[in-house]
Amino acid sequence: MLGRRRFVAGAVALSAAPFARRAFAAEGSVGREAFAPHAPITPIDARADRLIDVRVCTRPFRAEGPRIEVERIAGKTVVHNYGHGGSGWSLSWGSAAAALSLVDPKPGSRLAVIGCGAIGLTTALTAQRMGLRVRIYAKERPPEVRSAGATGVWSPDSRIVAEAHSTPAFERRWEAMARYSFRRYQSLLGLPGDPIEWHASYFLSDVPFSQAIDGGGESTEPDYPDLEDRLISDLHARSVALLPEQHPFPVPFARRGEQLTFNISAYARLLVDDFERAGGEIVTHTFDSPRQFRSLHEPVIVNATGFGARALLGDESIVPVRGQTARLVPQPDVHYNLYYRGHNLAVVGRRDGILVQAQAEDDFGNDRIEPDRAMSEAAVARLATLFPRTT
């Protein structure tokens, strides 16, 4: 079990949770030869005046896990595919396949997808590849959709289900979705613009990784199961401990691993372009009530509205989880990720900007979308301490 309070007290972004747990589990392994020599680590120019974007993403958490099921609404067959917490990008391809398997539409038939974020786009593309004629209806499209503000790393069990609801049946479905998505992402490596790539990831700590960091305090957020460690650990190489001479960071404890990373700007553009080249159409449309589904021409609708399903369907099982990210000016040689345990800092060296993330104690249950620039500037200042200037 991953204790949420312990994890936030340790101030590591939940996107790094699997990497962190592997670090805790492998405290003693020091890998002098486990990795080929890496290029020198380019320092990050961490200054607040280099911030180019600060935005908020609302993660749609459901204690029971994603809602992937069918019901009849307004004379339509509606397939729900929402509520993926912090795992939307990671599980999107497998979730799309699971959702569409519930209706098995015939090739050539028409299908509507409501929503143009991570889940909506991948569901639409998956349906096209099944031979369907697909139209997306959405209020927003990338880069305005909420999921465009995500961290951009492989995190398939991030806030995907509460520990109490992680049944054997759920875990089988989750594993199938995760493995399907992972295979799909490997087919997207090496494309122009590098929408998907593997990054070296460094996990840093002031104390041994086996030593818990407990900041105390109470939270209404549940604990989460360690699904990635238990069910798909074969998809990742283990992280290794680094000796002080093997890294430049001013910390006594460091580990290095590999992490699948999404350059969301390029990746979202790829998805939209592929969808439209295959004959798909994106229609700007706002739905205020599911009764409006009746006006659509398509007999089958996939509801991929994410957090929007809470208002659209009145689904109170969806809990908002606020997530703020900021981006620094891109640096061409910064293609690594950093997680500084105990300092509320996660960094992803994306090509569309060096992403800097910090968490707040009140993120769970918080649907506020206004950015807090001061919080991001403070995170950038903490990042700067990892690259002390010598001049």
Where are the predicted features?
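N-terminal secretory signal peptides and thylakoid transit peptides that target proteins
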Residues: 1-15
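Flavin (FAD/FMN) cofactor-binding and adjacent substrate-gating region
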Residues: 10-14, 47, 54-75, 147-149, ...
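Active-site substrate-recognition segment that forms the wall
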Residues: 28-74, 87-97, 118-130, 138-158, ...
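Short beta-strand to alpha-helix junction loop
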Residues: 87-91, 173-177, 255-270, 370-374
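Glycine-rich active-site loop/strand segments that organize a redox cofactor
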Residues: 141-177, 234
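N-terminal FAD cofactor-binding segment of flavoenzymes
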Residues: 173-193
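A conserved short coil-to-beta-strand element within the FAD-binding core of flavoproteins
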Residues: 281-294
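Short hydrophobic core segments
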Residues: 299-305
